[in-house]
Swiss-Prot record:
It is found in: Cytoplasm. It comes from the Bacteria. In the N-terminal section; belongs to the bacterial glucokinase family. Residues 1-20 are annotated as: Disordered. One of its GO terms (biological process) is glycolytic process. Keywords: ATP-binding, Cytoplasm, DNA-binding, Glycolysis, Kinase, Multifunctional enzyme, Nucleotide-binding, Transcription, Transcription regulation, Transferase. It comes from Paraburkholderia xenovorans (strain LB400). Pfam families: Glucokinase, HTH_6, SIS. Its EC number is 2.7.1.2. One of its GO terms (cellular component) is cytosol. This is Bifunctional protein glk. Residues 342-638 are annotated as: Putative HTH-type transcriptional regulator.
Length: 638
């Protein structure tokens, strides 16, 4: 069905090539859903009571069943809750869920979950005049910062900053800023509120429940008794009926909100306007229009003229969060592979019509089921696309990729947005599916972040030092000794004198014998062990070089000749190294492959190299590269 959020699609915009997108706005009471079939075309809106369903996945399944939609590849949820990492536990309802586990359970390629106020903020640039009402004067300045307030059960605060051709939404807890009264009536309100709370924030008096606080404070001033069952809804009803105390309370509420909105405007420089959402103000109607809101908004002394030019709007769109979450999802999908026209998803769409019918089936599989392409062997990919294996390879090369492996890497890069970038905590009661997925996702996320932030110039320097070393010693204490032993096992195949020490006394004794041309690779999660640092100082003073595999800005990283920084979430020394150990092992693999490439014979002698490798010539670096599982010798045999 058509809804109030439906907007005119861009000229020439067709349906989403990857199918309809599921949009959701989930609050503490209701879960609202819609389908976006093409940019700006949002329909099939349905509302479900949260209390009727045990969790998010169940209510989404019900919506998909009710709308009789075949498959959804991409979905986005705006939720009335902070979103930090993979695990979401609603504060105003008893739902708790893992984003990634829910995505897998529903079979989505993408499931994006954002704070509902962030989604509302992203909707603002697309609102039409029919979806907002201006209160007071002022003229909106294009391409300027926009502010947003949302008095509801709490007080949401956000802002939008223009950045080239897009907007950046600010996360904020501005509603918890300290309330400061501006007149005698507000002094009375503050005195009353202080008896209830040690810290009185604007949220206490300018959100929905604040109307009741104000009403009871002013009733105390007038020595009037207020029944216990009088709440905000009843007070607003009385104000509309003309009861003096209720009308005064609503006006004080609007004045406080005006002060707060003015604070946000001058703080953000919101020349693009201040928007008011939430469930309270739109229901006040003429009470708000006639209130002291705008007068108090402008009452900033020397900045009164500044604020007179800033417009204020009340959002009247029925489902504005759908517009915002749609914009966030669209940007997320666009940014999967850099957002440029050469991005792998966009390139597939652009080239699809020029492909052969068989290659087109592979393209459709990649667009609709990208994880299947990434995870499956070529025989399964060919079977699912109903093509031959050579057709899969031809498709990859038609996109400019060297082969299937190269295409999988580029496709995986485009999908990293669905992998949590924050550490997901394992909780008591998690099923094996949940905690297993969290451990794997945390590890994958850490490796992807390492790939993005690793200084490859430092990697090159470290490889050069190792390749030219007279002797290499690997030092690691405790859990890091596992990494040192693994490195020793790999590097001794290069014919360089190599050893690993996990005992501090052996490290000290050996380091005293090192000198120019020798290299120590020190592996440490904390990078702060004073005994290890003293040992390395002795070796470096004698001319040895030190490669550190550790966290950034640690004493070890600062001392080392070359630091390979592997930052991770395990920041407390009391935590067992799990993710950090994996990252350290990955760094050793990178260094070993790099040295193998440096020491490999010229490509013209590959045939001879393969022959030597078959004869067990382990000292040949090309054979070692193959032994490390990253080389080409094995493929040359096949």
């Amino acid at each position: 069905m058509s809804t109030g959020v439906q907007t005119k699609a861009a000229p020439g915009a067709g349906q989403h090539a990857d199918g309809p997108r599921l949009l959701a706005d989930i609050g503490g009471t209701n879960a609202r859903f819609a389908l976006e079939t093409s940019p700006g075309e949002i329909g099939s809106v349905k509302v479900y009571p949260c209390a009727d369903y045990p969790g998010v996945a169940e209510v989404i399944k019900r919506y998909l069943k009710d709308t009789k939609i075949g498959r959804v590849n991409h979905a986005a949820i705006a939720i009335a809750n902070p979103v930090d990492g993979d695990q979401v536990s609603m504060t105003n309802h008893d739902w708790s869920f893992s984003i990634e586990a829910t995505r897998r359970a529903l079979g989505f390629d993408t499931l994006l979950v954002v704070n509902d106020f962030t989604a509302l903020a992203m909707a603002l640039p697309g609102l039409t005049d029919a979806q907002r009402v201006q209160v007071g004067g002022g003229t909106r300045r294009p391409n300027s910062v926009i502010g947003l307030l949302g008095p509801g059960t709490g007080m949401g605060v956000s802002g939008l900053i223009p950045a080239d051709d897009r907007w950046i939404a600010l996360g904020s807890e501005g509603g918890h800023a300290t309330f400061a009264p501006a007149d005698e009536r507000e002094d009375i309100v503050l005195q009353y509120a202080r008896k209830k709370w040690s810290h009185v924030s604007f949220e206490r008096v300018a959100a929905g429940p604040g109307i009741e606080v104000i009403y009871r404070a002013l009733a105390g001033r007038d020595k009037k008794r207020v029944a216990a069952n009088v709440d905000t809804i009843e007070i607003v009803k009385r104000a509309m009926e003309g009861e003096p105390l209720a009308a005064e309370s609503v006006d004080v509420f609007c004045g406080i909100l005006g002060t707060f909105a003015g604070n946000i405007a001058v703080t953000l420089g919101a020349l693009g306007g201040i928007y008011i959402g939430g469930g309270v103000v739109p229901r006040l109607g003429e009470l708000f229009a006639r209130s002291s809101f705008r007068k108090r908004f402008e009452a900033k002394g020397r900045f009164e003229a500044y604020l007179q030019n800033v417009p204020t709007y009340v959002i009247t769109a029925e489902y504005p969060a759908f517009l915002g979450v749609s914009a966030i999802l669209a940007e997320q999908l666009s940014n999967r592979a850099g957002g440029s026209s050469s991005a792998v998803f966009e390139r597939i769409r652009q080239m699809r019509d020029a492909l052969t019918p068989a290659e087109r089936r592979v393209a459709d599989l990649a667009l609709n089921h990208p994880r299947s392409i990434i995870n499956d062997p070529i025989v399964d990919i060919a079977r699912k696309a109903d093509v031959s294996q050579p057709t899969v390879i031809r498709f990859c090369r038609s996109l400019g990729c060297q082969g299937l492996s190269d295409f999988k890497l580029k496709l995986a890069t485009g999908l990293t947005g669905t992998i949590p970038v924050s550490h997901s905590q394992v909780h008591l009661g998690d099923t094996a599916t949940d905690f297993g997925a969290k451990v794997l996702d945390n590890t994958v996320s850490a490796i992807l972040q390492l790939r993005e932030h690793l200084n490859f110039e430092h990697v090159e320097r470290a490889i050069d030092l190792l390749n030219g070393a007279r002797r290499i010693e690997f030092y690691g204490l405790g859990n890091s000794n596992i990494v040192a032993q693994d490195a020793h096992y790999k590097f001794f195949r290069f014919g360089i004198p190599t050893i690993a020490y996990g005992d501090l006394y052996m490290q000290a004794a050996s380091a005293a014998l090192l000198g120019k041309g020798d290299v120590i690779v020190a592996v440490s999660k904390s990078g702060r062990a004073p005994e290890l640092l003293r040992v390395l100082d002795v070796a470096m003073q004698a001319g040895a070089k030190v490669i550190a595999i550790t966290s950034s800005n640690t004493p070890l990283a600062k001392r080392a000749t070359v630091a390979l920084e592997t930052d991770h979430i395990e920041i407390r020394e009391s935590q067992l190294s799990m993710i950090s150990r994996i990252l350290h092992l990955v760094m050793i693999d990178i260094l070993a492959v790099g040295v193998a490439i440096r020491r490999a014979v010229p490509s013209a002698d590959v045939a001879e190299t393969v022959a030597k490798a078959r004869q067990g010539a382990d000292d040949d670096a090309t054979a070692v590269l193959d032994w490390l599982s990253h080389g080409a010798a094995s493929s040359a045999r096949d």
